[in-house]
Amino acid sequence: MRLRFYYIPFMRLRTYAVAVSAILVAIALISMGTRGLNFGIDFTGGALVQLEFQQPPVIEEIRSHLSAVGLGDSTIQHFGSDREILVRAPIISDESAAAMELISLIRETLSAQYGDQMDVLRIETVGPRVGGELREQGTYAILYALLAIVAYIWWRYELNFGVAAVIALVHDVVITLGIFSLAGVTFSLPVLAAILTVIGYSLNDTIVVFDRIRENLYIPEGKEKPSIISIINTSITETLSRTILTSGTTLIVVAVLYFFGGEVINGFAFTLLVGIIVGTYSSIFVASLLLVYWRPRYIEPHLKKLQEKPEEVV
């Protein structure tokens, strides 16, 4: 299904797109610089205890009980139903004995107050050294993914297309992380996996648009040569129905996961929900927009080469 009979001047909105992207990126960077990300114990190290009470507990009471035994810096929040509580406490030492002592202290302190009205549902521990290594490896995973993308698009198209795609992907990741920072959503290993998924999904949209742009750059001899902006607008319009269908159906599934999948998968679904929306926007208004601004130096020579060697268009 293609939109054959309509021409939508997307690049007419490029000034507004630049302003919107600049504002969103600035807000994201400021938020990450001031508030930071709410890293889970996967990256910071610590003990996690999930508790279920017979009656909805008061978080301030639980915090008061834990503060009395030196655990005042613990994070306490509802998880799932209003009868379930998640307690996260930092671990200073990498020794397994220290983790077990911390968990025992949490259980004994709360059991003394609530007795058989409380059940322990889940216990997790990650040492601070392991958490730091996971955070470092996660950062490298994103960087390696971006470098691999540049290499692939450089080989498949040209370097300027690869650079434009990576800038758009960095734009997507920064805005997604900024929304995470503003919302205070816990950043865990499943969320990191979702970030990498968003990078791949956004790149897929961008490649579809770039491929159509490259096809439309070739103008048979004797035909009037359209402007670069016109070529890009036409290319985006021709791929728009595909973008709407794929992004729309994926968003429906992700929205169902977010609203009905439960707390365990909530962060993963939230990342995909935000990332797909931002990625769809960037494939239209960011990656293609960079080609418009680079046209005198990069695109015009490419167009000239295609006129001389049309067989290079595959």
Curated annotation (Swiss-Prot):
Pfam families: Sec_GG (PF07549), SecD_SecF_C (PF02355). The keyword Cell inner membrane applies. Its main location: membrane. The chain crosses the membrane at residues 17-37, 137-157, 158-178, 188-210, 250-270, 272-292. One of its GO terms (cellular component) is plasma membrane. It is found in: Cell inner membrane. It is a multi-pass membrane protein. One of its GO terms (biological process) is protein transport by the Sec complex. The keyword Protein biosynthesis does not apply. SUPFAM superfamilies: Multidrug efflux transporter AcrB transmembrane domain (SSF82866). Keywords: Cell inner membrane, Cell membrane, Membrane, Protein transport, Translocation, Transmembrane, Transmembrane helix, Transport. GO terms for molecular function: protein-transporting ATPase activity. Forms a complex with SecD. Part of the essential Sec protein translocation apparatus which comprises SecA, SecYEG and auxiliary proteins SecDF. Other proteins may also be involved. HAMAP family: SecF_B. Belongs to the SecD/SecF family. SecF subfamily. Part of the Sec protein translocase complex. Interacts with the SecYEG preprotein conducting channel. SecDF uses the proton motive force (PMF) to complete protein translocation after the ATP-dependent function of SecA. This is Protein translocase subunit SecF. The gene is secF.
